[in-house]
Every structure is written in structure tokens, then in C-alpha cells.
């Protein structure tokens, strides 16, 4: 069975000072369906946003972000498991940092746990350990983490569900004639200098971090699919019907 990593960004599952329970509900229903066809690993963001629903402190302060992540991570996992239970599924939490992937021993231990979870029908739910991962908390929104997870945990494909519904030849928020690129086989260096960002305070990623993730995966003969996390129809059609009706495939 093909193994995939699904990464969902903070922008998709949080809004204002709360989690978007409707989008989380739709996401989990989608994941449950995917688990019938694939070995699925979820990489989730939004621990800080989840913490902010419980404690209203300034989230721009780095130490406050650490505190919010520490509060929010167990709450976020509990929400996932409450929703997964409706499909007779269980999620297991794995907290990692970029440094864990620098150690082959740590990577192997994590992979062993993930392999066993999948064998037992459990959904591995990975998040960055934002309470300690200072570098990652500042910029990235788990895009790099999800790329590393795809490579080191032997997945074939990374699916990023984002508020960015694909890669465009120019910034679609500034140019009405911007065209979405359906397939990309090579990441141009000038693209990595782009300044197209997401429009929410709830995450730290943008198109550049996603392109860097795609570049890493292409260099390791893996694929990445970027699609909207707000409207899951594109991702559903791609993964469940093997048709591309939107998004951008990096292969």
C-alpha cells in the first residue's frame, strides 16, 4: 500500500482566536477515507492557535508562543481523537524537531513507532515540538518537517493542504492574469526569492517554504501535491480518483 504524508497548515484549521472545528471535521472525514486506500501520516500545525483558544496572551512574543504550544498541543490532539473516534480510528502523537532528523538513530526510532502505528491502524499525528523548537517556531509552519517526514519515513508523496491552492506564475493576489502551474519538475532559484506570503497571523509559512519542501523532495525522487485545504475537492479527486482538477503537482 502506498504511503503518503498529509500536511495541514495553521491557516486551514484555525481562525481568529479559535480552531475551525468545521474544517477539522471535514479534514478528519477525508483522512479516514484516505486510510482505506493509503498508509497515512498526518503532519499538523496549529498547536499555538489551539493554545490561544485557552489562554489569551500576545502570540507575537516568542516565549508566549512556546507556552501556547505547550497548552495547545494536547488540546489539539484531543480534538483530533474525538473526531477520529467517529470513524473508529485512533491518532497517536509524535512531536519532532528538525534536529531529530539530523540523528539517524532518532529518525529510526520515530520511524519504528510510525510503522507500528500504521500496522495497528492508528493515524500517526506529527507536529513540531514548538515548546522547544525555537528556530522552527519563527518561520516554517511545518513545511520542512513534512518534507523530512515524507523522505525519512518512506512515504511516496507529500500532500500540503494550505490556504495557497497551487503555485502560480505570479502573485495571484496582485495580478488577475496569474496562471496556476499544474505540474512542476524543477524549482527555479528565482522562485525561492519570491515574497508571496499567506495572509493570516495563524501560521508562519508561505509559498517559499513550500517550494523549498518541494525542492528537497524532488532531489530525493519524491512527489509533492499542493492544494487548497479550505475546499478539499481537489485533494479528494487527486488522491481518491487519481485525477488532477486543480492544485500543483511537483514530480
Curated annotation (Swiss-Prot):
Superkingdom, natural source: Bacteria
Compartments reported by the entry: Cytoplasm
CDD domains tied to this protein: AAK_G5K_ProB
Record-level GO BP terms: L-proline biosynthetic process
Main location: cytoplasm
Pfam family, one: AA_kinase
InterPro entries according to UniProt: AceGlu_kinase-like_sf (IPR036393), Asp/Glu/Uridylate_kinase (IPR001048), G5K_ProB (IPR041739), Glu/AcGlu_kinase (IPR001057), Glu_5kinase (IPR011529), Glu_5kinase/COase_Synthase (IPR005715), Glutamate_5-kinase_CS (IPR019797)
Record's GO cellular component terms: cytosol
Residues forming coiled coils: none
Catalytic activity: L-glutamate + ATP = L-glutamyl 5-phosphate + ADP
EC number: 2.7.2.11
Biological pathway: Amino-acid biosynthesis; L-proline biosynthesis; L-glutamate 5-semialdehyde from L-glutamate: step 1/2
Any one Gene Ontology molecular-function term assigned to this protein's record: ATP binding
Record-listed ATP binding positions: 7, 162-163, 168-173, 204-210
UniProt keyword list: Amino-acid biosynthesis, ATP-binding, Cytoplasm, Kinase, Nucleotide-binding, Proline biosynthesis, Transferase
Binding site for substrate: 45, 130, 142
UniProt similarity note: Belongs to the glutamate 5-kinase family.
Function per UniProt: Catalyzes the transfer of a phosphate group to glutamate to form L-glutamate 5-phosphate.
Protein name listed in UniProt: Glutamate 5-kinase
Provenance organism: Campylobacter jejuni subsp. jejuni serotype O:2 (strain ATCC 700819 / NCTC 11168)
Amino acid at each position: 500500500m502506498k504511503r503518503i504524508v498529509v500536511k495541514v497548515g495553521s491557516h486551514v484549521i484555525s481562525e481568529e482566536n479559535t480552531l475551525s472545528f468545521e474544517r477539522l471535521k471535514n479534514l478528519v472525514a477525508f483522512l479516514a477515507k484516505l486510510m482505506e486506500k493509503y498508509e497515512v501520516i498526518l503532519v499538523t500545525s496549529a498547536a499555538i492557535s489551539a493554545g490561544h483558544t485557552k489562554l489569551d496572551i500576545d502570540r507575537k512574543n516568542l516565549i508566549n508562543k512556546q507556552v501556547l504550544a505547550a497548552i495547545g498541543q494536547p488540546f489539539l490532539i484531543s480534538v483530533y481523537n474525538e473526531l477520529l473516534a467517529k470513524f473508529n480510528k485512533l491518532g497517536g502523537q509524535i512531536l519532532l524537531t528538525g534536529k531529530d532528523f539530523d540523528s539517524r538513530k532518532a529518525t529510526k526510532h520515530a520511524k519504528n513507532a510510525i510503522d507500528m502505528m500504521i500496522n495497528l491502524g492508528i493515524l500517526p499525528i506529527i507536529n513540531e515540538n514548538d515548546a522547544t523548537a525555537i528556530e522552527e517556531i519563527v518561520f516554517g509552519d511545518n513545511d520542512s518537517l513534512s518534507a523530512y517526514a515524507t523522505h525519512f519515513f518512506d512515504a511516496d508523496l507529500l500532500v500540503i493542504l494550505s490556504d495557497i491552492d497551487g503555485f502560480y506564475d505570479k502573485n495571484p493576489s496582485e495580478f488577475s492574469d496569474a496562471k496556476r502551474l499544474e505540474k512542476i519538475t524543477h524549482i527555479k532559484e528565482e522562485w525561492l526569492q519570491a515574497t508571496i506570503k499567506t495572509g493570516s497571523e495563524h501560521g508562519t509559512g508561505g509559498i517559499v517554504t513550500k517550494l523549498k519542501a518541494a525542492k528537497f523532495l524532488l532531489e530525493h525522487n519524491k512527489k509533492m501535491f499542493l492544494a487548497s485545504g479550505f475546499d478539499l475537492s481537489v485533494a479528494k479527486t487527486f488522491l481518491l480518483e487519481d485525477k488532477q482538477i486543480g492544485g500543483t503537482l511537483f514530480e
